[in-house]
């Protein structure tokens, strides 16, 4: 399970031509592997997210990129953070994650969520549905994907999906861990308790105890052993050798994006940031709140392998 994950959130880098983007992504993944991270994640989106960039920024298709990264790494597990369930037929997704497991020699993880970015759906002609319908679709999908990953041939005539004796050969090389992303206490964490090996929360440090209490309650109702589920948190981070370097990198990133300095102030209000000691203290507070690990991204300077290595060393020591 994830103790220390590294997410690659953006693909536009200062001074890097389009022909060099993939090599820069590979360098991040290799630096993460070399510095203590146990998983490398990429987003499953077609447009860049608000707060990181613009819709027309560079964005690679998730599973193609993960399969390519598998050829350049040896130890880290590989996953989407997280797969938008609405983007793919669930039986096809089962085949896709199985292929990733084989090309990575058994290092695939299925990270999945209900999907949320309406602009992508509208632009690509993918039905967005209602909030409740997206969760209905996720649950139906899990009842197709998970049996296929276990060697079964599920049939389902559901409200949203229909499969008949769906075959998945070859089978994964080993049991593929399932991680469900999100923090919704009624729907998401209930699905974690019912289907997942891991939960990845998107919430504040102060909210962690309440989220864990909700997960505990769902496990108790469903008869699930809570100790089987590991809980991590997504952390948007900025780190530098010093506090001042960290802030300077954020300002340089904002300038590269053409953002006003007011955006930097907004980012500082959202990020876990600072020099190594400051970042370590903030992450220790998260661990002390009850989670098992963190997954971080370095939006402003992750394209610099030295910063990935600094984050790995710092967080490895902080988590203990």
Task: Describe each model-derived feature in a short phrase.
Residues 19-32, 93-96, 181-194, 249-252, ...:
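Short, acidic/polar
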Residues 2, 52-53, 80, 86-195, ...:
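Internal, glycine-rich beta/alpha segment that forms the wall or movable "lid"
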Residues 1-72, 174-176, 251:
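N-terminal beta1-alpha1-beta2 module of alpha/beta enzyme domains
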Residues 9-11, 45, 83-85, 113-117, ...:
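Active-site beta-loop-alpha junctions enriched in small/polar residues
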Residues 4-8, 40-42, 77-80, 108-112, ...:
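Hydrophobic faces of well-ordered beta-strands that scaffold small-molecule active sites
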Residues 8-23, 81-91, 173-184, 237, ...:
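Active-site mouth loops of central-metabolism enzymes
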Residues 33-34, 66-75, 97, 101-107, ...:
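Acidic (Asp/Glu)-rich catalytic clusters
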Residues 8, 33, 132-167, 172, ...:
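An alpha-helical appendage that flanks or caps ligand/catalytic pockets
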């Amino acid at each position: 399970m994830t103790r220390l994950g590294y997410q690659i959130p953006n693909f536009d880098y200062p001074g890097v031509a389009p022909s060099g983007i993939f090599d820069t992504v590979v360098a991040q993944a290799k630096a993460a592997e070399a510095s203590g991270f146990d998983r490398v994640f990429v987003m499953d989106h077609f447009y860049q997210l608000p707060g990181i960039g613009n819709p027309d920024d560079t964005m690679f298709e998730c599973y193609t990129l993960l399969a390519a990264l598998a050829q350049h790494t040896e130890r880290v597990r590989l996953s989407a953070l997280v797969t938008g369930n609405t983007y793919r037929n669930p039986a096809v997704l089962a085949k896709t994650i199985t292929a990733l497991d084989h090309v990575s020699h058994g290092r695939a993880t299925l990270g999945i969520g209900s999907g949320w970015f309406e602009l992508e759906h509208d632009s690509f002609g993918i039905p967005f549905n209602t909030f409740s319908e997206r969760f209905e679709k996720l649950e139906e999908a899990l009842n197709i994907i998970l049996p296929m990953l276990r060697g079964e041939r599920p049939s389902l005539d559901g409200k949203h999906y229909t499969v008949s004796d769906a075959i998945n050969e070859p089978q994964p090389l080993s049991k593929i861990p399932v991680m469900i992303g999100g923090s919704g206490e009624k729907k998401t964490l209930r699905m974690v308790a019912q289907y997942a090996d891991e939960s990845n929360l998107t919430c504040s440090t102060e909210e962690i105890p309440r989220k864990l209490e909700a997960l505990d309650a769902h496990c108790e109702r469903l008869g699930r052993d809570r100790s089987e589920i590991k809980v991590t948190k997504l952390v948007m981070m900025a780190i530098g050798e010093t506090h001042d370097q960290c802030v300077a990198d954020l300002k340089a990133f904002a300038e590269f994006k053409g953002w006003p300095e007011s955006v930097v102030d907004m980012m500082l209000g959202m990020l876990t940031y600072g020099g190594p000691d400051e970042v370590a203290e903030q992450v220790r507070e998260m661990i002390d709140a009850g989670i098992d690990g963190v997954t971080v991204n370095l939006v402003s300077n992750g394209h610099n392998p030295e910063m990935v290595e600094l984050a790995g060393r710092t967080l490895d020591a902080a988590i203990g």
